[in-house]
């Protein structure tokens, strides 16, 4: 099987042994320290004017007033959150078998279907778009609950709506994009976030994936390889960061796009395996001449890195909840084992 089959309308999954080397078709991008620093600084959030508890603490000032008293949700938000947590708790108790996921290294299809029907993929999406509309507090509680049963499911849900299509569309999308994608993400579609590349991790200035405008100005052609694409193996929608070359009429720079995973030219080259999170659908995705309409661009050309970092900052609010849930589950197992084990006659 060839690595890329442009005639296919579904993502091609190539076994690891037949996957081509993970090398960007655009070639490795070399930048010096000054350019790397300039790109990172240009993406810094400049509109945020509120004081930061963490920053103040770093500077030696303990600003308790910034975190206490902690804001509480209103009665309607609390009722909505508690009702959803009750349904999610029952689903986790009756429908999720952690041992099966660990054994098979995948989340069963019926579990994913059930989570969609429950609304778990739309927890952070507003009700006007078909989502549950949870506050961040109740969203974290839900992820903690799921993480205490199976962390891979927590990562699936978190990657989908904390950094996948819903978050950047909510923050930077047009009204048309919100109407198009948020209802899909709330109920039917799984999304993934594609930023990291084989040679590009914390140094975005070296981003090699390109998005070349077509001559008619109606689309971009994307080429590149993305690594560590959580949900990328099963995703229906992708958020892809790619570099638009500067040219007449195009500012250029790192730009964000919503891409249909069924687009010709997309290849899932392999599914990565992990010691933990065995059910995680994380892979390597190659894009070869993938045509993306102009209306699928999020924001303006050159705003992609700021969109990506802002999205990731929001996503970092959810990961600790999944970790706390997993730690809670581990403590439960240790406690149960400590009371069941006999040693030295006790």
Where on the chain are the PLM-derived regions?
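Extended, charge-enriched "interface" segments that sit outside catalytic cores
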Residues: 2-98, 105-106, 110
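Internal helix-loop-helix
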Residues: 117-188, 230-237
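Short Gly/Pro-enriched turn/cap motifs at secondary-structure boundaries
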Residues: 199-202, 228-231, 247-248, 274-281
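A structural signal for short hydrophobic beta-strand segments in well-ordered beta-sheet cores
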Residues: 209-212
């Amino acid at each position: 099987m060839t690595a890329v089959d442009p005639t296919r309308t579904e993502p091609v999954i190539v076994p690891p042994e037949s996957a081509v080397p993970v090398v960007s078709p655009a070639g490795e991008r070399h930048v010096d320290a000054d350019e790397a620093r300039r790109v990172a600084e240009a993406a810094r959030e400049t509109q945020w004017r509120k004081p930061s508890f963490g920053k103040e603490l770093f500077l030696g000032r303990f600003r308790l007033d910034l975190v206490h008293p902690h804001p509480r949700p209103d009665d309607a938000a609390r009722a909505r959150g508690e009702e959803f947590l009750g349904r999610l708790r029952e689903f986790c108790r009756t429908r999720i078998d952690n041992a099966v996921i660990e054994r098979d290294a995948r989340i069963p299809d019926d579990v994913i279907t059930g989570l969609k029907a429950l609304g778990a993929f739309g927890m952070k999406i507003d009700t006007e778009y078909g989502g549950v509309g949870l506050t961040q507090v109740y969203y974290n509680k839900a992820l903690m609950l799921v993480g205490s049963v199976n962390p891979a499911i927590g990562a699936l849900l978190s990657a989908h709506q904390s950094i996948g299509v819903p978050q950047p569309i909510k923050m930077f999308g047009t009204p048309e994009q919100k109407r198009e994608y948020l209802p899909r993400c709330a109920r039917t579609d799984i999304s993934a976030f594609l930023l990291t590349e084989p040679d590009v991790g914390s140094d975005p200035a070296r981003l090699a994936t390109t998005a070349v405008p077509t001559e008619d100005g109606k689309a971009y052609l994307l080429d590149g390889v993305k690594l560590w694409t959580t949900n990328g193996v099963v995703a229906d929608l992708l958020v892809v960061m790619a570099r638009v070359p500067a040219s007449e009429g195009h500012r250029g720079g790192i730009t964000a796009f919503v891409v249909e995973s069924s687009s010709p030219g997309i290849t899932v080259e392999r599914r990565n395996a992990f010691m933990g999170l065995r059910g995680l659908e994380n892979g390597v995705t190659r894009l070869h001449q993938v045509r993306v309409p102009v209306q699928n661009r999020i924001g303006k050309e050159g705003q992609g890195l700021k969109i990506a970092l802002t999205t990731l900052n929001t996503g970092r609010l959810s990961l600790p909840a999944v970790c706390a849930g997993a730690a809670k589950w581990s403590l439960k197992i240790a406690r149960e084992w400590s009371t069941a084990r006999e040693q030295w006659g006790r």
